[in-house]
Amino acid sequence: MDNISGYKDRAIESLTGKWGNSAIATLIYIIIFGGIAIAFSYGVPLTQSCSTKLDPLGNIIQIVLSPIAWGFEIMFLENIRKGDKELDLGKMFEGFKDYIRIMLTNLLRGIYTLLWMLLLIIPGIIKMYSYSMTNYILLDDPDLKYNSAIEKSMAMMKGHKMNLFLLDLSMIGWLILSIITCGIGILFLAPYNLTAHAHFYEDLKAEEQQNIAE
């Protein structure tokens, strides 16, 4: 496993020459999910005489579109594997090819995280990091789904949760910059963070394979 600086340097190297497309991909992602949040969190009247809130429907749509979130995440993993090739924005929508497995696995992941958060915040955060490799596992292990994929993520992250947390914490400066720039910085922070996560996963996978070989 690499150190924090190593993952950040590798992320920047992987995104060199691709920051523009990465920002465009992030903007598309924000527009899709941000638009849904605005439309359904604040409520859209069905008729002039009906002001019923559509929050439940909005939540359902968020779940239905979860493969896009999966695709956005794995797009950066595929990017580091491709090397010098252009960032493939189409990867963001590939989750719909394996729709049920991805959607239901992430639904379970979200439910488990929420239940832990309802108990205590810190255990919830710990579990969130335990489950953080699930989407990558869904990509690399097509036969795994639901609890099996989540459990494999938990096994891979055993002893590494703090490392990933500290990696995320080290990017707080970027987060502050995103706030100062009225959110513009997030167009670059998200690709940077997810690319660092992708490198982290690749090292976890290599470590797992080495342990199996031994």
Predicted ranges, named:
Residues 1-214:
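Hydrophobic alpha-helical membrane segments
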